[in-house]
């Protein structure tokens, strides 16, 4: 049996250029109401770029949230109006790595942490 979670109230508690935070009041299966904070985000793309020897191209970038430089895939926000995710991935690969790919395949479409 699937549980029902009804939103009984919702408010935006933070609006910023690339995120918003929404607080929903959710009626749980037992009847209690509980607050749930949801980060609303444009979404993002990441590119696994491999050369002819199957070596991956990685970047070393400062990430303020981590307080350090991280090794990561070329990636970026879906922040251009009406831009297809594949076009965003192509744009980010050029912007961040100076590369253009010969072929493209979708590996996954997912929530990183809903």
Where are these regions (language model features)?
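A short, polar/charged loop/turn motif at coil->beta-strand junctions and beta-hairpin connectors
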Residues: 1-2, 15-20, 67
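Residue-level detector of high-confidence beta-strand sites
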Residues: 10, 59-61, 109
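Active-site segment of metal-dependent pyrophosphate-handling enzymes
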Residues: 20, 42-43, 63, 72, ...
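Acidic, metal-coordinating catalytic segment for phosphate/diphosphate chemistry
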Residues: 9-46, 52
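Hydrophobic residues on conserved beta-strands that form the core of alpha/beta folds
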Residues: 7, 21-23, 35, 59, ...
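A short, amphipathic edge element
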Residues: 1-11
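Conserved Nudix-box catalytic region and its N-terminal flanking loop in Nudix hydrolases
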Residues: 2, 36-91, 95
């Amino acid at each position: 049996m699937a549980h029902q979670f009804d939103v009984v109230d919702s408010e935006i508690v933070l609006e910023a250029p690339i995120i918003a935070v929404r607080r929903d009041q959710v009626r749980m299966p037992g009847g209690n109401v509980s607050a749930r904070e949801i980060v609303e985000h444009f979404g993002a793309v990441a590119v696994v770029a491999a050369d002819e020897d199957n070596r991956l191209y990685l970047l070393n970038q400062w990430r303020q949230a981590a307080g350090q430089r991280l090794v990561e895939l070329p990636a970026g926000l879906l922040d251009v109006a009406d831009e297809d995710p594949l076009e965003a991935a192509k744009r980010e690969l050029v912007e961040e790595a100076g590369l253009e790919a010969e072929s493209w395949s979708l590996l996954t479409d997912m929530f990183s942490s809903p």
